[in-house]
């Protein structure tokens, strides 16, 4: 084997070989259980980020683990067309490169442009997924807008429409005036901001007066520009100030519209003035009040967020109405919405109707992609009736057909599902699945799979002009069908029969509503088992946390703290990293701050660590919490682990290749160490499998690390040396056999998490075991064998380790060179301790570097020694001639003084109120941790001083 482990040389060629050989495909053995995971489809034109790397590592670990258990295993891969995100990227691209908008291209040509862009950049993410080692079946790769999936989408839309579960309605939606499309509640980001509350007088009509004799009501509002669309004023029916005015009217300032005063709980007696203006077409709460009191709806805004030249007036059901005039005063027409706000306030003030302006804290909704203030807008949209679909989806989780891991996420799911709103599925975009609905000139709507079907079903001749709905479906509509559409539905395919319901869905908790809930609803509605019972899309939902940076901040381009997973695999220089973090920024003014932070964090760029080290780190961080802080130190630690495994394997091969390892018969004697490592390894298999079976990848990674590093490399390989240097033929055969057996099993055990290094080493080790199979990927996963767990060997070896560690600690504490042979005395030995010494003198002398071992009677004082208590004996190392008492005490005093200096420096820092107030929580915690460490070190040194002073 190469002297040093170099992941760059082995990973990519190995992956290409695996893919070419078809190892990622299901084995097709229907006598075996099936295991299937659907990959959450990443955006087709996106690139791999830490969240992808994290979730895909977890999925690949599960897939490889189940495949090695002989299951018929499919990891279904595919990408998402990502409507709004992809359209924005291409719009920005043509604006930058050609100075054009999508309207210059027209719909058809612009969509062609997006397909071109997909062809050009659509391979990026799948190339990157290959770099991660993902063992997905690439031959089955799907795209949410490929022909098969597009047919499934149309099929679902048409069936739901025919069942009256999809309808078209005039409703209020979150409207993004910049992107000119409806967006979902989940894409709205609420930001706190300082604003004003304007108090405006609305004159009472017909000579009416308030309880205290005023001829007007004062209405408080944070959005005076919407006054132009008011159709009512609400007061609380219990409010003694106004309840007698319910049913009377006010005259709307500026517009002179006569609008009613209604009694509604929505008006809070304690808030503002107790009178609330009602604008059903421009506020979600007002829309509900309007429905309760049959108030008309007046839309005053264009889709760009400007004031219209004439208003649109609708009745409560959304039909056009002439109950009010559509006139808007000329001075406000065509004004941008925030300019209109100023103009309306000025006009009201000029009439003497502005009572006061108060500062007011408010929450303003912004679109998370367009970045502008969202406008509630009355539009025609398509909706899915969600309550009917939600009922079985709630029951599936209640009765355990679907389980959430960790379980607490069920509550989040229930709270949303039990209060579910109808789902607005239309988007005013060009890129996506176009809604399969057509209109004739009279405005009648026809829904069908294509125009031909529509004409045939509705007997529409060629003379009837039809135009297709311009809108496309919300991207999440097609994603909701992902588990079954990818397997060939609506056809009844073999794949659907074998792999559905799928086994596990791995997802971030942030899309539990966007995606998980909608998959459950859609799948259970459309997929039934042979008894007609609704099928769930998956049996288990494994929720991951979000990966944040080392300070717990969310990774984002604007914070400049994004780490590209492949930069950790391949390494990246500082200049390249800076360019990546500060190039093409939306907010270039942040570049300087980002540059400084990056230079501080990565003064030499990022070293290459290889894919296996990245995967091991991600698995080790996969705790059940919501947030996971990324830690470069852990990554370095797991790269060191890979080096350690490589070097240990070289040691094993150097001692076994070309030797008799006992695989072809011949007498074998197993040493205590051999019996011990086989017992340890079997206990490790048991615990590791339990961790993987319960989705505790962090615990599994810890078990693997601890066994490999501490037991196998640090202890067992050392314990084999006495046999290697002087054992009998049978002993040599036994130890070589054990070395090879444990290493080969360990490689299979570790393979799901670190596939590349394990396959590479295994190809060398398999020869020694007489294995002829081609790949570790399809080898059986190790199974626990209770007969290999020799309790006596475990107990005896733990005792030997305890004795060896005690001697090593005395060397370190007394500053004695590691190579200097020592005398060891054991006093007051129990029978077990004495037996262990006599049976294992060779081990003890070699590993603890001992000249001699002497057992003393319990009452023998012995020479001046440093003593440690171990199980069943006192361990003494005579100090004569080993240390100079005065020099050693002086050295320790110096060490203590140095540590005291550090302690007082940190104590002063933590006593400084300015520092504590300003420094981030993580920094303060680090300082406290350092302080604890120094205090412990000081206590140890003082203890040593006492020991030496007593010599």
Swiss-Prot record:
Gene3D superfamilies: HUPs, Isoleucyl-tRNA Synthetase, Domain 1, Valyl-tRNA synthetase, C-terminal domain, Valyl/Leucyl/Isoleucyl-tRNA synthetase, editing domain
Catalytic activity from the UniProt record: tRNA(Val) + L-valine + ATP = L-valyl-tRNA(Val) + AMP + diphosphate
Binding sites annotated in the UniProt record for ATP: 557
One Gene Ontology molecular-function label: valine-tRNA ligase activity
PROSITE patterns: AA_TRNA_LIGASE_I
Coiled-coil intervals: 880-944
Primary site of residence: cytoplasm
BP terms from Gene Ontology: valyl-tRNA aminoacylation
Motif 'KMSKS' region: positions: 554-558
InterPro entries: aa-tRNA-synth_I_CS, aa-tRNA-synth_Ia, Anticodon_Ia_Val, M/V/L/I-tRNA-synth_anticd-bd, Rossmann-like_a/b/a_fold, tRNA-bd_arm, tRNAsynth_Ia_anticodon-bd, Val-tRNA_synth_C_sf
Motif residue range(s): 'HIGH' region: 42-52
Pfam families, per the entry: Anticodon_1, tRNA-synt_1, Val_tRNA-synt_C
Gene Ontology CC terms: cytosol
Domain statement: ValRS has two distinct active sites: one for aminoacylation and one for editing. The misactivated threonine is translocated from the active site to the editing site. The C-terminal coiled-coil domain is crucial for aminoacylation activity.
Subunit structure: Monomer.
Family the UniProt entry places it in: Belongs to the class-I aminoacyl-tRNA synthetase family. ValS type 1 subfamily.
Biological role stated in the UniProt entry: Catalyzes the attachment of valine to tRNA(Val). As ValRS can inadvertently accommodate and process structurally similar amino acids such as threonine, to avoid such errors, it has a 'posttransfer' editing activity that hydrolyzes mischarged Thr-tRNA(Val) in a tRNA-dependent manner.
Protein's name in the database: Valine--tRNA ligase
Species annotation: Shigella sonnei (strain Ss046)
Gene designation per UniProt: valS
